[in-house]
């Protein structure tokens, strides 16, 4: 960091602290309590009328300071919350009095003292000693308004977390959502596993991968675009129920709903089909909502989302008929469907195949109507290369997407376990990929096909978008709000302090 950006007054105070033989950045301090524990202890003492003056040690960042002659008040914050510290010069040793003069907002301090309440009833610690733990050399964002620049909030998330209680709560909620999902999966007998992030083949989804080169092996690897194929290998290997919560990487566009790296939970269950998985997802999400919110509803923007089971179920064909007025099977080729969409004044991307055009219709006409949790089922085969066909209509697959707040939050299907059919689907998928890009070599995942050839039982697979799910729990309409460090375009003027 260029020295000219450091606050001059803070630097002077830093030098004064050093001149008194104090290390402004000591290696440790051992608090006896968190702020939340200290407040709870004060309530317990008052309830029991126990007036013993136990000495506590607290630590945190100075967020507010008020000086009144020989008395000072500071609010310090740790990971559990805020605590007011009461300083009276008569109670402090000389070293603490001198140090007090050189403390600023943003500094980390350790304090020792006993609990009390002020005349206004504020829980406080009456300090008898203060220690310097870390001297802040840059000013914090303005106290009352926090950090308002949205892009700066994302680029400098640490300032956002310091300044905005809502941001801190968002990521506490995110952590809890993942923990509750994990507990639910474990209770249902699923084994949590870890599969490779670096893979020799980019499989499991139709998406552009990130490519990296392994120097020692002298070969390229792909960062995974899905968890699917390795998890299904484990079903082949004899684990009946497996899941993974992990990062996925797709070298594609950025939007309020898409980030190049994102978190998925994928699970695979032997001897289940997509209807079983539908019931399972419905139970899981509604249970997580109830565990975290106390009921089955969540506020989202101007509406209330109701996750009470059962959720509505709508076939994709019926949905597109209802909201777009098109039966896509009346237009069975890319050319005929594109012509019909053009006739209806819809923009058509000539690079997209028939399945992608159907997906466009769903995104344009269907998803805007699906606000409450809804299952969209029975996708065309062209859109679902890894899903089983429906026996009663081989043009369709046993697949569903869960839509909520106009966006997909989960995707699942009865897994294709016929190795011959899977090879044919892979080859078709490969042709589609080659049409999307010509700068990368592509190949079929032969090892996965070999695994299928040894036999995989009927299996229901599920993928849940953790980031989008957290958006619902935290009432955010942008994925960047729920990812600690979202991908952003490089900007030269943010490389130095603004």
From Swiss-Prot:
Pfam families: tRNA-synt_2, tRNA_anti-codon. It is found in: Cytoplasm. SUPFAM superfamilies: Class II aaRS and biotin synthetases, Nucleic acid-binding proteins. It is an enzyme of class 6 (ligase). Its EC number is 6.1.1.6. It comes from the Bacteria. Coiled coil: none annotated. Mg(2+) 2 binds at residue 408. It catalyses: tRNA(Lys) + L-lysine + ATP = L-lysyl-tRNA(Lys) + AMP + diphosphate. InterPro entries: Aa-tRNA-synt_II, aa-tRNA-synth_II, aa-tRNA-synth_II/BPL/LPL, Lys-tRNA-ligase_II, Lys-tRNA-ligase_II_N, Lys-tRNA-synth_II_C, NA-bd_OB-fold, NA-bd_OB_tRNA. The keyword Cytoplasm applies. GO terms for biological process: lysyl-tRNA aminoacylation. Binds 3 Mg(2+) ions per subunit. Keywords: Aminoacyl-tRNA synthetase, ATP-binding, Cytoplasm, Ligase, Magnesium, Metal-binding, Nucleotide-binding, Protein biosynthesis. Its main location: cytoplasm. GO terms for cellular component: cytosol. CDD domains: LysRS_core (cd00775), LysRS_N (cd04322). One of its GO terms (molecular function) is tRNA binding. Its cofactor is Mg(2+). Mg(2+) 1 binds at residues 401, 408. Belongs to the class-II aminoacyl-tRNA synthetase family. Homodimer. This is Lysine--tRNA ligase. It comes from Dehalococcoides mccartyi (strain CBDB1). The gene is lysS.
């Amino acid at each position: 960091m260029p020295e000219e950006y450091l606050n001059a007054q803070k630097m002077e105070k830093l030098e004064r602290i050093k001149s008194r033989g104090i290390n402004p950045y000591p290696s440790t301090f051992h608090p006896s309590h968190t702020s939340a524990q200290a407040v709870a202890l004060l309530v317990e003492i008052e309830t029991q009328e126990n007036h013993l003056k136990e000495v506590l040690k607290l630590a945190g960042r100075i967020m507010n300071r008020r000086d009144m002659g020989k008395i000072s008040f500071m609010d310090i914050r740790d990971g559990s919350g805020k605590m007011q510290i009461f300083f009276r010069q008569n109670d402090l040793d000389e070293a603490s009095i001198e140090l007090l003069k050189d403390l600023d907002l943003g500094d980390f301090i350790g304090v020792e003292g006993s609990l009390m309440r002020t005349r206004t009833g504020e829980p406080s610690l009456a300090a008898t000693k203060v220690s310097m733990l870390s001297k802040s050399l840059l000013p914090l964002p303005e106290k009352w308004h926090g950090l308002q620049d949205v892009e700066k909030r994302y680029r400098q998330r640490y300032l956002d977390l310091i300044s905005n209680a809502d941001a801190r709560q968002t990521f506490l909620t995110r952590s809890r959502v993942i923990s509750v999902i994990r507990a639910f999966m474990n209770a249902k007998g699923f084994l949590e596993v870890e599969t490779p992030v670096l893979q020799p083949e980019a499989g499991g989804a139709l998406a552009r991968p990130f490519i990296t080169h392994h120097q020692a092996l002298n070969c390229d690897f792909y960062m995974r675009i899905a968890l699917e194929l390795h998890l299904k290998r484990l079903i082949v290997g004899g684990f009946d129920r497996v899941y993974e919560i992990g990062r996925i990487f797709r070298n594609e566009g950025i939007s309020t709903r898409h980030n190049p790296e994102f978190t998925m939970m994928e699970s695979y269950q032997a001897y289940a089909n997509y209807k079983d998985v539908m019931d399972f997802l419905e139970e899981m999400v509604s249970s997580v909502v109830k565990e975290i919110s106390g009921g089955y509803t969540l506020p989202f923007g101007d509406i209330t989302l109701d996750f009470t089971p059962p959720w509505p179920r709508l076939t994709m064909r019926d949905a597109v008929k209802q909201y777009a007025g098109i039966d896509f099977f009346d237009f069975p080729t890319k050319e005929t469907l594109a012509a019909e969409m053009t006739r209806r004044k819809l923009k058509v991307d000539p690079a997209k195949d028939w399945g992608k055009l159907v997906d466009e219709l769903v995104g344009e006409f269907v998803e805007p109507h699906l606000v409450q949790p809804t299952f969209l089922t029975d996708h065309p085969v062209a859109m679902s290369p890894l899903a089983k066909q429906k026996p009663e209509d081989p043009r369709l697959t046993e697949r569903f997407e869960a839509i909520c707040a106009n966006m997909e939050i989960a995707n699942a299907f009865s897994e294709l376990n016929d190795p011959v059919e899977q090879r044919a689907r892979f080859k078709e998928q490969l042709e589609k990929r080659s049409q999307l890009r010509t700068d990368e070599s592509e190949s079929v995942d032969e090892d996965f096909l070999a695994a299928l050839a040894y036999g995989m039982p009927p299996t229901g697979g599920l993928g849940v978008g953790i980031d989008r799910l957290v958006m619902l729990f935290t009432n955010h309409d942008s994925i960047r709000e729920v990812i600690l460090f979202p991908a952003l375009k490089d900007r030269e003027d943010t490389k130095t302090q603004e």
